[in-house]
């Protein structure tokens, strides 16, 4: 995203006040939205489209670490992950990187889906929901 800022929206309801924070807001999406103590990350992709799936996975996981840190959270608080792979032959290589990154005993709910991604060079995309 080219725009790096945080926007907040405070909505007063009948019984409570709700805070909605958007991070890195662009024309089409925000990289992260925080609401009611839950962090929602947009699908994260690698910067280097020429890299192999393991390198791209490390880049994506570093982005996730950075974004969660901005919201005051970390990977131990991840609730759910959806991993998108255009080629399921990359499943084992991706899992090796994932297993080295995720804290032992802190694995979240997870699904891995084969899907065509937005650009042909993307070998992995990861979407995360985490506790703040």
Residue ranges and their predicted role:
Residues 2-79, 85-132:
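N-terminal presequence-like segments and the immediate start of the first folded domain
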């Amino acid at each position: 995203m080219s725009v790096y800022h945080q926007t907040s929206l405070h909505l007063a309801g009948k019984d409570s006040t709700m805070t909605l924070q958007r991070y890195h807001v662009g024309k089409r999406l925000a990289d992260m939205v925080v609401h009611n103590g839950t962090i929602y990350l947009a699908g994260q992709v690698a910067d280097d489209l020429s890299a192999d799936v393991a390198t791209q996975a490390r880049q994506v996981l570093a982005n996730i670490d950075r974004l969660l840190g901005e919201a005051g959270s970390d990977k131990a608080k991840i609730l759910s992950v959806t991993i998108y792979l255009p080629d399921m032959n990359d499943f084992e290589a991706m899992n090796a990187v994932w297993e080295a990154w995720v804290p032992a005993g802190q694995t979240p709910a997870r699904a891995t889906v084969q899907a065509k991604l937005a650009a042909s060079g993307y070998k992995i995309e990861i979407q995360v929901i985490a506790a703040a």
